[in-house]
Amino acid sequence: MKHMSNVKIERYESIIKDLISHAITTLVYDDLIKQATVHYVTLSKDKSIAKVYISCYDKTIIDKILKKINGASGFFRTILAKNLNLRKAPAIVFLNDESIDKIDEINSLLEQIKGK
């Protein structure tokens, strides 16, 4: 059975993911940032840091998006502060979600094996 605090952190991670996804699609006017898709969020045990894993369809611009969206992390933190029932809103760090690239790599390897 999961420890109660783990369940609470997972619930906060889900809420943070929803809030940031909604903000990107509805509140952000920057076309570059709008291309980002939030895949998942990890929240530190003390709830002080939220790592937000994003990706985009065009892999060539992910570095530009990360630079720009990390520059706007204060905007997203303000949204969290207004919507989360926490004493202090977590600092937000946006990171590239490389899991999709790894899945594609595994699938291509499986196709190569299947072709032999």
Swiss-Prot record:
GO terms for biological process: maturation of SSU-rRNA. InterPro entries: KH_dom-like_a/b (IPR015946), RbfA (IPR000238), RbfA_dom_sf (IPR023799), Ribosome-bd_factorA_CS (IPR020053). The keyword Cytoplasm applies. Disulfide bonds: none annotated. GO terms for molecular function: ribosomal small subunit binding. It holds the Pfam family RBFA. It is found in: Cytoplasm. Gene3D superfamilies: 3.30.300.20. GO terms for cellular component: cytosol. Keywords: Cytoplasm, Ribosome biogenesis. Belongs to the RbfA family. One of several proteins that assist in the late maturation steps of the functional core of the 30S ribosomal subunit. Associates with free 30S ribosomal subunits (but not with 30S subunits that are part of 70S ribosomes or polysomes). Required for efficient processing of 16S rRNA. May interact with the 5'-terminal helix region of 16S rRNA. Monomer. Binds 30S ribosomal subunits, but not 50S ribosomal subunits or 70S ribosomes. HAMAP family: RbfA. This is Ribosome-binding factor A. It comes from Malacoplasma penetrans (strain HF-2).
